[in-house]
Each structure stands twice: as structure tokens, then as C-alpha cells.
């Protein structure tokens, strides 16, 4: 099951961007250590022009109980369509069972100005 979390992004006066991050598991057969995750980043404009927006990378931290942490960097989006950036996962062994926490940062530029959006912190539950 994907985890979908929506947060508010850049604010410029009354205009803003909203980021909707969807994380899902790679359910290809095989050992769990060879599986990975993917995400799509849906950018919803709330009165802000999307033309000057470019997204460079998304850094996602997964934290399990017992302080076991995985970090994965999503960069070079494989697809950009209608304000949706799709990223493939880098890294292995990211599929686990149980409940943990997840944190994401979005790196990009708007109108040539760099920004880092500490997007969201949430809980994720993976059942199988």
C-alpha cells in the first residue's frame, strides 16, 4: 500500500506549492534485500507559476526501531508530466516489515533561486 502525505511547500505571498509524496514498494519477486522503493512527487500549484520550478533531488530517510536507519536519495527524475516527478529508488534492502518513521527533504530551484523544503515527517507501515 502506498503512503501518501501532503504538505505545504514554497510560500510566496498568497501563492504556494503543495507537495504530495507517494512512496510505494517494489513488489517484484525475489529476496527482500534486492527490492527497493519508488516515489512520485506531485506538485500542486496554488496560484504559483510552475514554469520556473525545477526539482533536483529528494532525500528520504527511513528509520526503523532499534535505530536501524536507511537513507535513499532520489535524483534525476525519470519522468516529469503535468507537475508530477517520478523517481526510481537508489539502494537495496529498503523493504521491511513493521512500522517506522520516514522523513523527506526536497531540493530544487524556483526562478533560479535554490530552495530546500523539509517536506514532511510521518509514519509508514509495511505489512509484507
Residue ranges of model-derived segments:
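Short acidic, flexible loop segments centered on an aromatic residue
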Residues: 53-64
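A eukaryote-biased signal for short, well-structured alpha-helical docking elements
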Residues: 1-18
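Short beta-strand elements
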Residues: 114-128
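A structural signal for short, hydrophobic beta-strand segments that form beta-sheets
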Residues: 7, 21, 55-57
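Short, solvent-exposed, Trp/other aromatic-anchored flexible loops in extracytoplasmic proteins
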Residues: 44-50, 64-118
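Short intrinsically disordered, low-complexity coil segments enriched in acidic
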Residues: 1-4, 41, 76
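A generic structural signal for short beta-strands and their flanking turns/coil linkers
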Residues: 35-39, 56, 100-102
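Contiguous beta-strand segments within globular domains
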Residues: 17-45, 51-52
Amino acid at each position: 500500500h502506498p503512503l501518501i502525505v501532503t504538505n505545504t511547500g514554497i510560500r510566496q505571498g498568497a501563492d504556494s506549492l503543495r507537495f504530495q509524496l507517494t512512496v510505494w514498494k517494489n513488489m517484484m519477486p525475489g529476496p527482500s534485500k534486492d527490492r527497493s522503493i519508488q516515489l512520485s512527487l506531485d506538485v500542486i500549484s496554488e496560484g504559483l507559476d510552475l514554469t520556473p520550478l525545477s526539482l533536483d533531488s529528494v532525500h528520504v530517510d527511513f528509520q526503523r526501531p532499534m535505530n536501524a536507519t536507511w537513507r535513499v536519495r532520489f535524483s534525476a527524475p525519470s519522468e516529469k508530466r503535468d507537475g508530477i516527478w517520478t523517481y526510481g529508488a537508489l539502494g537495496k534492502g529498503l523493504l521491511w516489515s513493521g512500522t517506522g518513521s520516514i522523513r523527506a527533504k526536497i531540493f530544487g530551484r524556483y526562478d533560479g533561486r535554490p530552495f530546500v523544503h523539509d517536506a514532511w515527517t510521518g509514519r509508514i507501515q509495511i505489512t509484507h
